[in-house]
C-alpha cells in the first residue's frame, strides 16, 4: 500500500489488480484515487508494472509482461528477491522514475533478459504444448524421488544420456536459481547461452554443460520404468511428459525488461543478494 501511495504522489496513473481492491480501499480510506483492473487489462494498459513480492512473483509478472514489452520493477517482499531492484526500505528511490539527470536523460534504465521458448513434442513429432519462461525448464519425476532416463540433443545430434533425478535448462537469469543449487554455472546475463545442469546424476562423468542460445535443445523421455515425467517452467507451469515424448527448447523471441534505478553491475548484485547465504 505504501508503494502505491508513494507513486500516486507523482504525475502518473496508479492502477492495481482487482483482487487487491478491498485491501487497498480499506487501507487507503479515500486518500488517493486508484484504478482497479483485471490482470489482463492491467498489463495491456500499463507503461510499467511494479511487483511487490519475491522472485516467484516477478517471474509471474515477467510471463504476463513480456508479450507486451512492458518493463517490470520488482520490490522485494520475499527472502532473497534476486531479481528485485528495491527493498521496502529503499522506496525513496522510486523518485528516480520521474527524474532526469543534468543531460536530460531518465534516471532509470532497463536490462533486457532472454527467455526460453519451450515445446512438448509427441512421439510423432507434433507440438502438443508450448510455453515460455524467464528462468528455467526442469524435467523430473515429480513428487516421487526415483531416477529417470533421458537423452539430450543439440541441433538434432545426440549429446549424452542421463540417469539422474532430473535435468535443468536455464537462461543466464535462471542460472542463479535452481540450476546454481544443483551445481550449475553462474552465467552473466550479457552472455547468450543455455546452462544445462543434471540433478543428482548417477555418474562420475556427468557435468553441467553450456550451449549457445541459438541452438535447439531437445530432451527425450526414454524412461522405461515410468509412464510419464514432468516438465516445469519457471516453477509455475507443469506438464506431463509421456514416454517417447520430447521437450524442445529454443531462445524465445520474447524478452523480459527489468527496471534498474541504480548502476549496480551483475556481480555487485550477486554479492549483495547472496551474501547471507554463502
Segments from the language model and where they lie:
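ATP/NTP phosphate-donor binding region
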Residues: 1-48, 52, 89-109, 120-131
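N-terminal glycine-rich "phosphate-gripper" loop used for MgATP/nucleotide binding
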Residues: 51-55, 63-64
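Gly/Ser-rich helix-loop-strand patches that form or flank binding pockets
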Residues: 60, 64-78, 82
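Catalytic core of DAGKc-family lipid kinases
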Residues: 79-165
Amino acid at each position: 500500500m505504501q508503494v502505491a501511495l508513494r507513486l500516486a504522489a507523482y504525475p502518473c496513473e496508479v492502477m492495481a489488480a482487482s483482487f487487491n481492491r478491498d485491501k487497498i480501499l480499506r487501507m487507503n480510506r479515500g486518500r488517493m484515487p486508484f484504478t482497479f483492473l483485471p490482470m489482463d487489462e492491467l498489463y495491456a494498459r500499463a507503461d510499467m508494472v511494479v511487483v511487490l513480492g519475491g522472485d516467484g512473483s516477478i517471474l509471474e509478472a515477467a510471463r504476463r509482461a513480456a508479450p507486451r514489452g512492458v518493463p517490470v520493477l520488482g520490490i522485494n517482499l520475499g527472502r532473497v528477491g534476486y531479481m528485485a531492484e528495491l527493498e521496502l526500505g529503499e522506496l525513496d528511490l522510486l523518485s528516480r522514475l520521474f527524474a532526469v539527470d543534468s543531460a536530460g536523460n531518465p534516471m532509470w534504465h532497463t536490462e533486457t533478459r532472454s527467455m526460453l521458448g519451450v515445446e512438448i513434442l509427441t512421439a510423432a513429432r507434433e507440438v502438443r504444448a508450448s510455453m515460455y519462461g524467464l528462468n528455467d525448464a526442469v524435467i523430473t519425476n515429480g513428487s516421487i524421488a526415483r531416477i529417470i532416463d533421458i537423452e539430450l540433443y543439440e541441433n538434432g545430434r545426440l549429446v549424452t544420456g542421463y540417469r539422474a533425478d532430473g535435468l535443468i535448462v536455464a537462461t543466464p537469469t535462471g542460472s542463479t536459481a535452481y540450476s546454481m543449487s544443483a551445481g550449475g554455472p553462474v552465467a552473466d546475463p550479457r552472455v547468450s547461452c543455455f546452462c544445462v545442469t543434471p540433478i543428482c546424476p548417477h555418474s562420475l562423468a556427468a557435468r553441467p554443460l553450456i550451449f549457445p542460445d541459438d541452438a535447439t535443445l531437445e530432451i527425450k523421455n526414454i524412461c522405461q520404468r515410468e509412464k510419464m515425467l514432468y516438465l516445469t517452467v519457471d516453477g509455475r507451469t507443469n506438464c506431463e511428459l509421456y514416454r517417447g515424448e520430447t521437450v524442445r527448447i529454443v531462445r524465445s523471441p520474447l524478452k523480459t525488461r527489468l527496471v534498474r534505478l541504480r548502476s549496480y553491475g551483475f556481480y555487485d548484485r550477486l554479492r549483495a543478494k547472496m551474501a547471507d547465504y554463502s
